[in-house]
Amino acid sequence: MSGSRARAFRAFAPVYFSVFLFVAGSSAVSVLVPVYLSRQAHLGLAAIGAVVGVYGIASLAARIPVGLLYSAGRGRGLLVGGGLLSALAFGLVPLVHGTLALTVLMALNGLGWSIATTAQLALLVARPPLGASTAVAMGWFSGATGLGNAVAGIVGGSLADAAGLRVTFFVLAATPLVGAIAMWRSIGAAPAGAPMPPRVGRRLAVVRMPLAVWVGVLVMFFINCLNSITNTFQPVLALGAGLSLTQIGVLSSIRSWASSSSRFGSGPLFARFDPAGFTMPLVVAGTLATCFIPSVIGSFVAQIPLFVIAGLSRGLLRVTGTADAFDAVGQNDRQHGLTSAFLYGGLDVGKIVGPVAGGVVAGAFGIATMLRVLPFAFLLLYLALAVPARRAARPVAGMS
């Protein structure tokens, strides 16, 4: 039994350590960049939202080309190349102060993140450790993602308070490159005799994507809209209310701990209950938790339960949306790449819409008002698109 556990650990650890490092570095940077833009670059709220939003724009722009380019044989090279670009962007941030230069670095980071993570997720589904099922692989993947977010907030905020933003950015620059190398070594090259998927036109490949993939994209979009406005503007509002960077980082980490723990435990939960029944309550819970943040912004303790609820909502929604999408496409190598691209694309659109819309509304009415109103707007948009899509999917599922 111990030998079996050791074998499982050797198979799972490097792969999910890679996922952990990528997310930990990116999440820590996302917490610190708005503060850096405000304190060092002296940008206004609308400008901060626009610069941060460039990251999502660049990431989104690369998704579909990377998804179409992806194959099992190219995946490892894409992973390492993307990690190198993100590492370069992280390390250069504290060396520049101009708005244009910082915007370019956000774009470079978004490009690297897009290339690396699209390949990473597709490789994981194509060759999961020990042949694990998609649900198990996605549960561990989402759990490692949440764990990376959890550690990032504490480490990033504490290190920035102790050593300064400049040193912290240099340290974080190592995370995407080390993560890429860890997975590159553990996955290994594609088998020489592996069959190639049939080649179809790009437009046809997109049209043939199952409806479950598009529903998953909507889920990803919604959770990242809420997450991005919180990450971008809650630190600025909390600093003005008297919280320290360490406290802000701890709150971010609490949300991520709740998210990661729910993801690791999602397998047994969804084996007994229908995941679809949890979707609407989780969407509403995440919306309300975000809306109540400004009402208790001056209290570190009072914000803890709100961040816990937001983390639980995000974590469980991330697992269900991803697993359903990949189960729908089966073992098609091309569709693995495209599904990964589309799901991450939903997250990327959320990263764009959240900071930009948040910056515009906050610039006009203040951050507190924005955090109370904008989550409901995202909820209404999600309902308008997701409910008809799920209704259309039921007859298709019944015919299969």
Q: Locations of the language-model features?
A:
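Juxtamembrane intracellular "pre-TM" segments in multi-pass secondary transporters
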Residues: 1-9, 188-216, 400
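Helix-loop boundary and gating motifs at the non-cytosolic
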Residues: 9-52, 56, 214-216, 224-237, ...
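Residue-level signature of mid-helix packing/kink "hotspots" within the transmembrane helices
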Residues: 56-64, 149-150, 256-260, 264, ...
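Helix-to-loop junctions at the C-terminal end of transmembrane segments
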Residues: 62-74, 160, 262-274
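Structural signature of the two symmetry-related core transmembrane helices
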Residues: 77-91, 173, 277-292
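Cytoplasmic helix-loop-helix junction between adjacent transmembrane helices
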Residues: 109-144
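Intracellular juxtamembrane helix-capping segments at the cytosolic ends
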Residues: 115-129, 316-331
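C-terminal membrane-cytosol helix-exit motif in multi-pass small-molecule transporters
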Residues: 174-194, 384-389
